């Protein structure tokens, strides 16, 4: 994008769209307010997650979640949206039990089943 970090942080939607257009891809732009953009301009603003996810390995957990959803037949955009939501929810649940300071990526993994259960039981629509 050839711009400064502050420009990206202040323009997440625009920057994510530019990446999707430039590279013809779905973009997951991680931040304190994660944004997912599609090839045709759809934008999803994630509502879950917290500072507990700002740890080494957290992005790897997210990538694995998105990949697993794609492997189950979801579109890349839908898998990215749901993966980001569930990953953030797992982080929220872990933070509630362990504190933001004590959560490791491995803890987030342990909370994924509970985040899926909450998503299914509460009939949440992220799409």
Predicted features along the sequence, with ranges:
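Short, charged, surface-exposed loops that flank catalytic or proteolytic processing sites
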Residues: 3-12, 73-78, 99-103
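Charged C-terminal helix
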Residues: 91-127
């Amino acid at each position: 994008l050839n711009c400064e970090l502050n420009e990206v942080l202040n323009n997440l939607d625009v920057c994510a769209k530019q990446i999707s257009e430039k590279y013809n891809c779905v973009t997951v732009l991680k931040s304190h307010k994660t944004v997912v953009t599609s090839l045709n301009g759809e934008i999803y603003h994630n509502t879950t997650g917290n500072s507990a996810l700002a740890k080494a390995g957290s992005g790897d957990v997210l990538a694995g979640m998105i990949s697993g959803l794609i492997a189950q037949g979801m579109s890349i955009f839908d898998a990215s949206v749901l993966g980001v939501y569930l990953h953030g929810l797992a982080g929220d649940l872990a933070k509630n039990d362990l504190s933001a300071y004590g959560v490791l990526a491995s803890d987030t993994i342990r909370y994924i089943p509970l985040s899926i259960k909450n998503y299914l039981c509460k009939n949440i629509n992220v799409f």
